[in-house]
């Protein structure tokens, strides 16, 4: 029953009694946060953990202050050394009077509840020590604001869970829940902090701290958006730069294509020019060959004369040798033995005779060449005369042909005229015959018409009679026989 009463009393305290010391700790934490904002936004995780631990501490402090009697003895005098050490470690100089000893009611009720409360207080002291160590590390490293901001959302529900666990453990404990608190870990409170009982002020301070944390978050989110926007702008610039590069490459490729087309066109023009030059050279070589052929043809009759002259010159020494042999034979046949003088004279005579012969031979050669030229000229003249004669013959033949054609035309015209005359005579005869025939026909037609007129009434009467007979004998109209049978059957 006592444990149930204690639990209900603790529940009423946690719902109704405010903690004045919580305001002081929140104001100090807000001052530290503003100081850290000057350099960089501090991690809110450490602050949230610290505030949660302070909430658990103030609940314990309120319980202790509630159950502390007027004449109770506090054991804070013996723990001053521990308090000073904790001040140096945590950096907080806000500590309350510690009551590590049990109250008078705990002494009356006994020790089992005291042991349970000691275990719960040990758990809370460990959580508060962790929070103070995180706060110190956050103060030493203020530059890691973004990482702590990402950890803040994770740490807050954990901190809330730790406070709820500590409260549930306090509710479960049967014996005195005031327990021995931790030794100077920043969660104890002074007796002066319990004097203010205004819950509105604590709530306003909590709302202020939440607004400040929201402002810090907005600033951090702005800081996060700024680099993302700069990254987006950098990405857009990279895309524009890459598009410009691709456009430049396309332009370069187009220029290369144009250059290749120009090169191909220049090559084609060069090939055409070289072909034209070659054709011109070939035409020139052909003209040169034609001129050389014409010159060789012109030089061929002239070249025959020196060849004939060389053959004649080669024949001269043979003639000289033959003449000398003849003279020697003549001298031997005479049997003369002339002297040297006669021999020399004979030699001179023979030389002179040879010269005369050479002269005569050369003259004969010149005459032969002249005769050849005359013969060639005569031949050309004869050819020209023959051509003239052939032309005259052609003219005469053409004239004869024209004469024969004219004679044939005249004969044809005469024949056509005679034929026309005969035809005209025949036509006249036929006309006379036609006229006689027409007269005869007219006469015959007149006689026939008169005879037909005479025979016409007779035929009508006969027809009428036949019709009457036919009707009497029941004969058809087309039946002209005397038989009873119809024609065609």
UniProtKB/Swiss-Prot annotation:
Gene Ontology cellular component terms for the protein in this record: cytoplasm; extracellular matrix; extracellular region; nucleus
Biased composition (Basic and acidic residues): 143-159, 217-227, 275-287, 346-358, 420-442, 453-478
Subcellular location, principal: nucleus
Motif Cell attachment site, residue range(s) on this chain: 334-336
Compositionally skewed regions (Polar residues) per UniProt: 263-274
Compositional bias annotation for Low complexity: 123-138, 316-332, 398-419
Pfam families listed in its UniProt record: DMP1
Annotated Acidic residues bias: 82-100, 386-397, 479-489
GO aspect biological process, one term: regulation of bone mineralization
Region: Disordered, residue numbers: 22-489
Changes after translation: Phosphorylated in the cytosol and extracellular matrix and unphosphorylated in the nucleus. Phosphorylation is necessary for nucleocytoplasmic transport and may be catalyzed by a nuclear isoform of CK2 and can be augmented by calcium. Phosphorylated (in vitro) by FAM20C in the extracellular medium at sites within the S-x-E/pS motif.
Tissue specificity remark: Expressed in tooth particularly in odontoblast and ameloblast.
Subcellular location: Nucleus; Cytoplasm; Secreted, Extracellular space, Extracellular matrix
Example GO molecular function: extracellular matrix binding
Glycosylation sites: 340, 378, 443
InterPro entries given in the database record: DMP1
Record's keyword terms, sorted: Biomineralization, Cytoplasm, Extracellular matrix, Glycoprotein, Nucleus, Phosphoprotein, Secreted, Signal
Signal peptide (UniProt feature, chain positions): 1-16
Keyword set includes Cell membrane: no
Biological role stated in the UniProt entry: May have a dual function during osteoblast differentiation. In the nucleus of undifferentiated osteoblasts, unphosphorylated form acts as a transcriptional component for activation of osteoblast-specific genes like osteocalcin. During the osteoblast to osteocyte transition phase it is phosphorylated and exported into the extracellular matrix, where it regulates nucleation of hydroxyapatite.
Assembly and binders: Interacts with importin alpha.
Protein name (Swiss-Prot/TrEMBL): Dentin matrix acidic phosphoprotein 1
Lineage: Eukaryota, Metazoa, Chordata, Craniata, Vertebrata
